[in-house]
Swiss-Prot record:
Reactions it catalyzes: an [RNA] containing cytidine + H2O = an [RNA]-3'-cytidine-3'-phosphate + a 5'-hydroxy-ribonucleotide-3'-[RNA]; an [RNA] containing uridine + H2O = an [RNA]-3'-uridine-3'-phosphate + a 5'-hydroxy-ribonucleotide-3'-[RNA]
Name of the protein in question: Ribonuclease 1B pancreatic
Disulphide-bonded residues: 54-112, 68-123, 86-138, 93-100
Organism (species): Pygathrix nemaeus (Red-shanked douc langur)
Binding site for substrate: 35, 38, 69-73, 94, 113
Length: 156
């Protein structure tokens, strides 16, 4: 009789674990492509020289929760133009991987750098609007940007 009591919860446990496994991605898990867009895309605006742009955007895009991200770049171009970089000039990533691509043309970006002495929870950023070639790492099917690797002044 004790055996019967232990057998009933096991299938229930299996069902619960399966449901949690299927539901997990929809419970806030974000793909690398979605994370790239959240952290780097700001298509609806122009590069800003406003000293508050980076402070506001870094907080709004959840990059100051628990710590201050030291550097981040926002791209002010249509998403499709940034996605098309994945089919442009292939370059080696800073970490040595070979899935990086450099934009053929310069793009409008804003670079955010943590100011000296700034510490969590009071993250303060210097805002620098620029026009540069961007380098992104691409993966997946469809092939899309998943990591902002760098920006460079010229195309060489």
């Amino acid at each position: 009789m004790a055996l019967d009591k232990s057998v009933i919860p096991l299938p229930l446990l299996v069902v619960v674990l399966l449901v949690l496994g299927w539901a997990q991605p929809s419970l806030g898990g974000e793909s690398q492509a979605e994370k790239f867009q959240r952290q780097h895309m700001d298509s609806g605006s122009s590069p800003s020289s406003s000293s508050t742009y980076c402070n506001q955007m870094m907080k709004l895009r959840n990059m100051t929760q628990g710590w201050c991200k030291s550097v981040n770049t926002f791209v002010h171009e249509p998403l499709v133009d940034v996605q098309n970089v994945c089919f442009q000039e292939k370059v080696t990533c800073k970490n040595g991987q070979t899935n990086c691509f450099k934009s053929n043309s310069k793009m409008h970006i804003t670079e955010c750098r943590l100011t000296n002495g700034s510490k969590y929870p009071n993250c303060a950023y210097q805002t620098s609007p620029k026009e540069r070639h961007i380098i992104v790492a691409c993966e997946g099917s469809p092939y899309v940007p998943v990591h902002f690797d760098d920006s460079v002044e010229d195309s060489t």
